[in-house]
Amino acid sequence: MSILLSPPSLLLLLAALVAPATSTTNYRPDWNRLRGLARGRVETCGGUQLNRLKEVKAFVTEDIQLYHNLVMKHLPGADPELVLLSRNYQELERIPLSQMTRDEINALVQELGFYRKSAPEAQVPPEYLWAPAKPPEEASEHDDL
């Protein structure tokens, strides 16, 4: 038994089969795993690897400095990754950035709750000082009971 598909149907089928294999940039946060997210670090090499990734390089050189609680760490030979950390610098998750565009990285960082300043030297509003983490809960009046 053979199944004949019209050209449009064949294209749709092909697109459906290829899409999952190419959708490496569609990172979806697992919020249960990211409980306690407080800061982030982008780890990448400073040279040749980054120079081949124009979009990632633009994010690293121009955008990181705009985000509160997000820093850059140069590691020789490292592929670019966003490392998500707890308040105690415990690693929660690593997200590869090599296949992402600058816009995708910015959207991801903002979705994760990092505050984007208007300029590198701009002040962070008080309500965002703990971003992306939630501020510590007020101590209960009954903690000593």
Swiss-Prot record:
The record's comment on protein family reads: Belongs to the selenoprotein M/F family.
- UniProt tissue specificity: Widely expressed. Highly expressed in brain.
Name of the encoding gene: Selenom
Name of the protein in its database record: Selenoprotein M
The record's region (Disordered) falls at 125-145
- Report residues of the Cysteinyl-selenocysteine (Cys-Sec) crosslink: 45-48
User: Which residues catalyse the reaction?
Assistant: 45 (nucleophile), 48 (nucleophile)
Query: Which BP terms from GO are recorded?
Result: adipose tissue development; corticosterone secretion; hormone metabolic process; multicellular organism growth; response to selenium ion
Task of the protein: May function as a thiol-disulfide oxidoreductase that participates in disulfide bond formation.
Keyword Nucleus belongs to the record: no
Residues making up the signal peptide according to the UniProt record: 1-23
Q: Does the keyword Endoplasmic reticulum apply?
A: yes
